[in-house]
């Protein structure tokens, strides 16, 4: 099949949500609809308790982190879907943000009772950096929650994105009877389903169908009135606005009951964009170019000390990957033979034979690959848009054995290049300050320092609230350094960073130094 045809079939996306909105359940059920049924079945057997296919990022010491489930590829109708998992709860990390730089669209999952929550707002800000198209699924309609129209207002108000309802719920909680599809003019009646069957639910064609009155009684007339109101009061779906990231199509349902997801997946396959290409520092690389290009957005280490292998995740931007091909690792200027790339089809960690734009392949990495690295078939390219994000949590590294200082510095430098943490060295002392966006990142770093560098290290609280990279002309920066050097550090790449003791302090500094920029992201 031609490169163009294969590329057009690809849909690469991630799910953004607040913990407990149902992301894991939605992921599982999408796999079910994608025919990866063995995965939904394997969910219960993997551990004695009910653990889910995509929840892999617990520190699974005994057998290492299962890399396979961080990317799940499955076919649905005539498209091939690549779902990138975004760790949610306490294992939230900068990886979650960076994963969003490697997708072409995102699915926002919202709990009907809770509406828009903090984490969703943060993840949405990251999607905004690239105007990523967003689809929305409002989940848990089998429970009581906010009125649908109120939820749409909240999404529009808080996230500044127009909502276009595609499906509409008929009641909720105990009165939940199904959903109406505004564009297909069909009603799907609700039936709860067990975990392993895709729920069909009876389909009634036409809002004026008398069968609706038989099934729903007085609710049918209420539904007709409500739909008339909804059509008048809400936005009509515009594909162009969706692709620009200014409008989100909204679907309602109950993931735990496999209900409403088929409409969502159909909409996703129909409207979500295929891979188009990506901006590099010198030019725009189109997905249909013949030569392979790709970039690294994540590196995942194996937590098993016996297996030091790390896997670098590469998003293919253009061309076709074929097993055994040689690629240029642009940053180090070397050609490397990619003999054993990993592919992620239906949760089998297999060797990739071929892969196309939009696909993710795993490269075995022995410490030479960094986040943001570009691979090509010879051209000196550097893809942009894979940033470091300003950390939100900070700790100072304290050594138990001062003789291990060199090993600690080496370990922290390498781990920061890999994206496990960020390292800041204050100008005025020898402190090593670590930054992260999720608390588990510190535990992972401590464990890896011990296993891989034989360094025992404690992390203690430090008086830093937030960090910003400082950009400006040299004369202004020199003046700045002379005045505030006690709060200035260098990151692992040698870039200047202001480490603010409080948010208020940061605001004051920004006001006092209007010629300088204090930015929350920095390109790798």
Swiss-Prot record:
PROSITE patterns: G_TR_1, G_TR_2. GO terms for cellular component: cytosol. Keywords: Cytoplasm, GTP-binding, Nucleotide-binding, Protein biosynthesis. GTP binds at residues 17-24, 85-89, 139-142. One of its GO terms (biological process) is regulation of translational termination. Its main location: cytoplasm. InterPro entries: EF-G-like_DII, EFG_III/V, G_TR_CS, P-loop_NTPase, PrfC, RF3_C, RF3_dom_3_sf, RF3_GTP-bd. It comes from the Bacteria. It is found in: Cytoplasm. Coiled coil: none annotated. One of its GO terms (molecular function) is translation release factor activity, codon specific. Residues 8-276 form the tr-type G domain. HAMAP family: Rel_fac_3. Increases the formation of ribosomal termination complexes and stimulates activities of RF-1 and RF-2. It binds guanine nucleotides and has strong preference for UGA stop codons. It may interact directly with the ribosome. The stimulation of RF-1 and RF-2 is significantly reduced by GTP and GDP, but not by GMP. Belongs to the TRAFAC class translation factor GTPase superfamily. Classic translation factor GTPase family. PrfC subfamily. This is Peptide chain release factor 3. It comes from Hydrogenovibrio crunogenus (strain DSM 25203 / XCL-2). The gene is prfC.
């Amino acid at each position: 099949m031609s490169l163009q045809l294969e590329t057009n079939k690809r849909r690469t996306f991630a799910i953004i949500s607040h913990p407990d909105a149902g992301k894991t359940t939605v992921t599982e059920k999408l796999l079910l609809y994608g025919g990866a049924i063995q995965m939904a079945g394997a969910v219960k057997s993997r551990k004695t308790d009910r653990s889910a296919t995509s929840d892999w990022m617990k520190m699974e010491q005994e057998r290492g982190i299962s890399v396979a489930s961080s990317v799940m590829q499955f076919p649905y109708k005539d498209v091939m879907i690549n779902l990138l998992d975004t760790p949610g709860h306490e294992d939230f990390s900068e990886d979650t943000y960076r994963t969003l730089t490697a997708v072409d669209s995102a699915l926002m999952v919202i709990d009907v009772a809770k509406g828009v929550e903090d984490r969703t707002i943060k993840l949405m800000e990251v999607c905004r950096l690239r105007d990523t198209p967003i689809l929305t699924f409002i989940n848990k309609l089998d429970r009581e929650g906010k009125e649908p129209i109120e939820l749409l207002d909240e999404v529009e108000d808080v996230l500044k994105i127009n909502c276009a309802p595609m499906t509409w719920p008929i009641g909720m909680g105990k009165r939940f009877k199904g959903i109406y599809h505004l564009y297909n003019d069909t009603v799907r009646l609700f039936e709860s389903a067990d975990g392993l069957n895709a729920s069909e639910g009876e389909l009634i064609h036409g809002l004026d169908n008398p069968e609706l009155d038989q099934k729903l009684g007085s609710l049918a007339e209420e539904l007709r009135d409500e739909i008339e109101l909804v059509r008048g009061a809400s936005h009509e779906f515009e594909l162009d606005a969706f692709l620009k990231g200014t409008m989100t199509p909204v679907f309602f349902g109950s993931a735990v009951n496999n209900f409403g997801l088929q409409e969502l997946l159909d909409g996703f396959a129909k409207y979500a964009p295929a891979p188009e290409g990506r901006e590099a520092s010198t030019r725009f690389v189109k997905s249909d170019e013949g030569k392979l290009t790709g970039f690294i957005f994540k590196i995942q280490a194996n937590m098993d000390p016996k297996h030091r292998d790390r896997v670098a995740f590469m998003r293919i931007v253009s061309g076709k990957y074929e097993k055994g091909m040689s690629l240029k690792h642009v940053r180090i200027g070397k050609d490397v033979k990619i003999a054993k790339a990993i592919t992620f089809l239906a949760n089998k960690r297999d060797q990739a034979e071929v892969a196309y734009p939009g696909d993710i392949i795993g490269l075995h990495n022995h410490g030479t690959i960094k986040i943001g690295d570009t691979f090509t078939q010879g051209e000196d390219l550097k893809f942009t848009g894979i940033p470091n994000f300003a950390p939100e949590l900070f700790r100072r590294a304290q050594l138990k054995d001062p003789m291990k200082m060199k090993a600690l510095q080496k370990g922290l430098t390498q781990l920061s290049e890999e994206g496990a943490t960020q390292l800041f060295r204050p100008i005025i002392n020898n402190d090593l300050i670590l930054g992260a966006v999720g608390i588990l990142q510190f535990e992972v770093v401590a464990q890896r320092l011990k296993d891989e560098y034989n360094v025992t290290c404690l992390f203690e609280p430090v008086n830093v609230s937030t960090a910003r990279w400082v950009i400006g002309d040299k004369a202004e920066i020199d003046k700045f350094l002379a005045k505030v050097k006690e709060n200035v550090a260098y990151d692992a790449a040698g870039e200047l960073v202001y480490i603010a003791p409080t948010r208020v302090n940061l605001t004051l500094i920004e006001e006092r130094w209007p010629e300088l920029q204090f930015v929350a992201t920095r390109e790798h």
